[in-house]
Amino acid sequence: MRQTLVLDVVGLTPALLAHAPNLKALAAAGGLRPLTTVLPAVTTTVQSTFVTGLLPRDHGIVGNGWYFRDLAEVWLWRQSNRLVQGEKLWE
């Protein structure tokens, strides 16, 4: 079986690889493929789409924060796989 490494570095563009020689060498030895994003193009939404193959409307993660009505507060970066609906690629 061929092994695959997926390295998800938020905000890393091919132009920035010049400043990261080890990552550039890793990409050159293996491969580098562009990805198109989903909207909203924020970290938790995009990563949830990446690991489930589902659109935000289907996995339920539509931003980096969650509004809790009972507290009337937005909490940012609530990170838990339980928040993402849909089967993850490692399941």
For the regions a language model picked out, list residue spans one by one:
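Hydrophobic "anchor" residues on beta-strands that sit immediately upstream
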Residues: 6
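Active-site nucleophile/metal-coordination loop of metallo-enzymes that catalyze phosphate/sulfate
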Residues: 1-3, 11-91
